[in-house]
A protein has these predicted regions:
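N-terminal structural segment of carbohydrate-active enzymes
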Residues: 1-162
Length: 162
């Protein structure tokens, strides 16, 4: 497992609100290095007792491989947190090895009840959600390639453009 290939940041294009209820979360890994990724997630303030011990309540969901650019693979998932906030970390599976990837880095073996190596999305703020203006639906977009309008070498009969 290429540990240097793992990257996530709680913000920007890696974790953001799609709408008032949904978070979109992405993880970047080295290309063709990881077999699967699961997201361990839950509300940061939901705790319960298991075997007489207070533990953070969390769920595990598989992420989907969204694409690759030949250097990195990109994994993603959409989550609907019940209270618009989320604590989460990743379970990364590769070559029979499973590691936990969180804010503090990579940990092996993973601790299912981990509360110290997590990412936290504090709250889905309506002001942070992108809303396209109404006029954009009626817009016609053009791509202009200026180099295709003038060929200074036209007399030579070549197809060369500037």
């Amino acid at each position: 497992m290429n540990k240097a290939g793992l990257y996530h940041h709680c913000g920007d294009q890696w974790c953001y609100a799609l709408d008032n209820d949904t978070l979109h979360i992405r993880l970047k890994t080295a290309a063709d290095d990881i077999d699967s990724v699961d997201l361990v997630h839950g509300d940061p303030f939901e705790w319960g007792k298991i075997d007489g011990k207070q533990v953070w309540r969390s769920n595990i969901q598989p992420m989907t491989k969204a694409g690759t650019n030949g250097v990195h693979d990109f994994w993603e998932i959409r989550i609907t947190p019940p209270y618009k906030r989320l604590k989460y970390w990743f379970l990364v599976h590769a070559n029979g090895e499973t590691c936990e990837f969180g804010e503090k880095g990579l940990v092996s073996p993973p601790d299912r009840w981990n509360t110290w190596n997590t990412f936290i999305f504090p709250y889905i703020q309506p002001a942070e959600i992108f809303h396209a203006p109404e006029w954009i639906a009626d817009t016609v977009w053009y791509q202009i390639f200026p180099e295709r309008y003038h060929n200074p070498d036209a007399a030579s009969g070549t197809e060369k453009n500037t």
